[in-house]
């Protein structure tokens, strides 16, 4: 019979590691021989130099720089002898004789001079620490001119408002009187008649001869209809077709904004007015009419289209092709 003794198995202990694994050596750095995919635009041969101390000589100011407007003849500070000490402010009667363009130019010239004097006076008080008030005296004279300009403009504004309020009550009688005089002018006086009509539509309704300068509002619509009817009545006495068209129109008066626009924009000749009347008859036969609720939007669109067509017609052929 075998005598078997129980014991511990030692295979695991004998197979166990007694040291850590030796680490692998680091790989050698690879040398990239290919060119970089992107080349920098900086210079690789830059050299560090000493800083340049700030100086006025290092600053180059362009001759057309806007800040030169605050300097008189590009001087840092004018002498007292360079100031206009012998002039006087503009008087109100003198300014009343000037046009709006002249007053506008004089205002901005005075404003520019006041800005120059304010800068020089500030330098005189702070940098130089002088008590000389020569610059302030000249500035006061310029300021007097400026408030007088505003006074004259205020007078004109109030005169315009008062005259406009008074004219509202007489505008209907004035329009009737002009219509009577306009239609009485003979065919030989057509040029003078339509010059008067142009001034009339500008003064009463604010309608310009240049279509792109107009603002379409109720005043424009009313003036457009009146001018269209005057043109039709003017030539109806000379052309039977136009007279027939006028007789077929209800109350002998064009009221549709689309119809009035056709006659209003045509040339002031018998032939063109006749063609416009024929176009209006075609619109009536097709049932095309503009509702009075859509007059403003529709006429505004007509005006924009006409202005674009005129601008394209005046462009050179090379610009249109491009």
From Swiss-Prot:
- InterPro entries xrefs: MRP-L47_sf (IPR038340), Ribosomal_uL29_mit (IPR010729)
Q: What name goes with this protein? A: Large ribosomal subunit protein uL29m
Disordered, as annotated region: 1-44
Q: How does it assemble?
A: Component of the mitochondrial large ribosomal subunit. Mature mitochondrial ribosomes consist of a small (37S) and a large (54S) subunit. The 37S subunit contains at least 33 different proteins and 1 molecule of RNA (15S). The 54S subunit contains at least 45 different proteins and 1 molecule of RNA (21S).
Gene (name only): MRPL4
Which superkingdom heads the taxonomic lineage of this protein's source?
Eukaryota
State the Gene Ontology BP annotations: mitochondrial translation
Q: Which organism is it from?
A: Vanderwaltozyma polyspora (strain ATCC 22028 / DSM 70294 / BCRC 21397 / CBS 2163 / NBRC 10782 / NRRL Y-8283 / UCD 57-17)
Quote the subcellular location field of this record. Mitochondrion
> Which Gene3D superfamilies does its entry note?
6.10.140.1190, 6.10.330.20
- On whether Ribonucleoprotein is a keyword of this UniProt record, the answer is yes
Query: Organism classification, top ranks?
Result: Eukaryota, Fungi, Dikarya, Ascomycota, Saccharomycotina
Q: Give the family per the record.
A: Belongs to the universal ribosomal protein uL29 family.
Keywords for this entry? Mitochondrion, Ribonucleoprotein, Ribosomal protein, Transit peptide
């Amino acid at each position: 019979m075998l005598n078997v003794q129980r014991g511990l198995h030692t295979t695991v202990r004998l197979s166990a590691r007694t040291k850590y694994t030796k680490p692998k050596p680091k790989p050698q750095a690879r040398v990239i021989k290919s060119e970089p995919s992107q080349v920098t635009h900086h210079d690789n041969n830059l050299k560090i130099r000493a800083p340049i101390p700030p100086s006025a000589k290092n600053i180059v100011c362009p001759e057309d720089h806007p800040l030169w407007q605050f300097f008189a003849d590009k001087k840092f500070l004018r002498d007292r002898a360079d100031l206009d000490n012998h002039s006087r402010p503009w008087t109100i009667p003198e300014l009343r004789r000037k046009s709006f363009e002249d007053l506008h130019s004089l205002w901005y010239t005075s404003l520019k001079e006041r800005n120059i004097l304010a800068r020089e006076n500030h330098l005189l008080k702070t940098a130089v620490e002088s008590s000389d008030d020569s610059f302030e005296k000249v500035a006061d004279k310029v300021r007097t001119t400026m408030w007088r300009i505003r006074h004259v403009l205020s007078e004109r504004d109030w005169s315009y408002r008062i005259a406009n309020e008074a004219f509202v009550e007489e505008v209907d009688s004035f329009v009737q009187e002009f219509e009577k005089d306009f239609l009485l002018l003979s065919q030989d006086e057509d040029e003078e008649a339509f010059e008067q009509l142009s001034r009339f539509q500008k003064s009463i309704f604010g309608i310009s001869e240049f279509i792109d300068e107009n603002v379409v509002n109720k005043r424009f619509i009313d003036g457009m209809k009146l001018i269209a009817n005057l043109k039709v009545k003017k030539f109806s006495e000379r052309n039977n077709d136009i007279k027939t068209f006028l007789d077929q129109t209800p109350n002998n008066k064009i009221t549709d904004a689309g119809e009035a626009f056709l006659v209003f924009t045509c040339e002031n000749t018998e032939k063109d007015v006749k063609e416009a009347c024929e176009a209006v008859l075609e619109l009536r036969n097709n049932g095309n009419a503009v509702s009075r609720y859509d007059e403003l939007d529709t006429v505004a669109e007509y005006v924009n289209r006409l202005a674009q067509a005129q601008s394209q017609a005046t462009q050179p052929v090379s610009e249109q092709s491009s």
